[in-house]
């Protein structure tokens, strides 16, 4: 992939592993602290990055409005309607002309709306992600606390940088952990930037967010349900609550990544595993958002080319009914996540859920071809 980072940009390369038994790991050496330090220091944006942040806000709003009347989105709104904000402030909901609600519930409702059609931005590396999932919780918090547009933009930039750096350096799916485990700490870091919180508070927020967001990938296997849209929205809500608790002075489990009973040791590669995470060096402006990309079609990112192929075959008037067998030569990710390599018989069932079929290369090709 072509990176849009500028020549000469400096990064800090962080080696992350389980710390030795019987030894304490100073917080300044912990990944969560380094993320928090980056978040607290982020205070300026390049002009082209500012434009891209605007693009991502527009894209999120568009896909949310497209999904606004789908049942999972309506039900998420109903949950938020139970938590109107009693004072001045609060956050708005997609699909409602008025009213403000507690930001954590607005984040949930709006997060489901953005995620429902699987049509917002994407970033694939060692793991998978939709970094635009960070925007609904950040926007909700910004509305409730009255943040400026600049502070919101800086928060979004930090969240993208954090999530995409984690996705580049730490593979979750090989251990059947869902990618919301990278999303929640990214949201916490972004809120920290937007609210000008101290490193200590952001650090505790990142720890708690990750601790609570380590879900399995069953949400994306077998009979896939609307929880696929709720999972990132719930992670955003969790991050908001973590920040609220940390602001009151409460502490969280640490070292969350490197601890002997932490995430790496027991949920990822184990006590002997080492991961490399790259964050902007001190004084460097985050730019990872420039490496995210949007979709043309409402389906898994790896299905975009398959849909185009199906349309092309349809245009050539090749009758699908006369085809006995189709071989798709594709990537490892496509084969195992949306192809026959997934081992999910549900992906071959035309009556399966929408969430299942938008992750089925077989179904997607057939529909586009027809």
Predicted regions and their residues:
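Short, Lys/Arg-enriched N-terminal segments with co-localized hydrophobic residues
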Residues: 1-10
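N-terminal core-entry segment
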Residues: 9-290, 341
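Intrinsically disordered, low-complexity Ser/Thr/Pro/Gly-rich interaction regions
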Residues: 14-19, 301-370
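Aromatic-acidic/polar surface patches that form glycan- and anion
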Residues: 127-130, 180, 299, 354, ...
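Glycine-rich phosphate/diphosphate-binding loops and the adjacent beta-loop-alpha structural elements
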Residues: 288-298, 302
């Amino acid at each position: 992939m072509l990176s849009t980072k500028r020549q000469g940009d400096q990064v800090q390369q962080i080696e992350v592993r389980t710390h030795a038994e019987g030894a304490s790991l100073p917080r300044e050496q912990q990944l969560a602290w380094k993320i928090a330090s980056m978040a607290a220091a982020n205070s300026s944006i390049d002009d082209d990055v500012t434009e891209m942040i605007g693009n991502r806000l527009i894209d999120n709003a568009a896909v949310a409005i497209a999904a606004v009347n789908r049942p999972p989105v309506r039900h998420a709104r109903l949950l938020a309607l139970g938590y109107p904000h009693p004072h001045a402030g609060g956050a708005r909901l997609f699909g409602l002309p008025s009213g403000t609600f507690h930001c954590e519930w607005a984040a949930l409702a709006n997060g489901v709306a953005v995620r429902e059609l699987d049509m917002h931005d994407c970033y694939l590396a060692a793991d998978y992600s939709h970094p635009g999932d960070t925007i609904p919780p950040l926007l909700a918090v910004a509305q409730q606390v009255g943040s400026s547009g600049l502070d919101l933009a800086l928060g979004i930039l930090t969240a993208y940088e954090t999530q995409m750096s984690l996705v580049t350096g730490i593979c979750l799916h090989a251990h059947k952990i869902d990618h919301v485990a990278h999303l929640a700490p990214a949201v916490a870091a972004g809120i920290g930037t937007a609210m000008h919180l101290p490193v200590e508070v952001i650090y505790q927020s990142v720890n708690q967010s990750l601790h609570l967001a380590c879900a399995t990938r069953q949400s994306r296997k077998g009979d896939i349900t609307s929880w696929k849209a709720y999972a990132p929205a719930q992670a955003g809500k969790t991050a908001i609550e973590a920040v609220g608790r940390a602001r009151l002075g409460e502490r969280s489990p640490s070292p969350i990544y490197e601890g002997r009973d932490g995430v790496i040791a027991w949920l990822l590669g184990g006590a002997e595993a080492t991961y490399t995470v790259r964050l902007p060096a001190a004084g460097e402006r985050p730019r990872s958002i420039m490496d995210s990309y949007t979709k043309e079609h409402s389906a898994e990112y790896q299905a975009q080319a398959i849909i185009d192929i199906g349309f092309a075959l349809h245009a050539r008037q090749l009758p699908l009914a006369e085809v006995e067998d189709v071989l798709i030569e594709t990537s490892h990710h496509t084969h195992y996540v949306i192809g026959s390599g997934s081992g999910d018989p549900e992906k071959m069932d035309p009556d399966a859920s929408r969430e299942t079929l938008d992750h089925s290369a077989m179904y997607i090709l057939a529909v586009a071809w027809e």
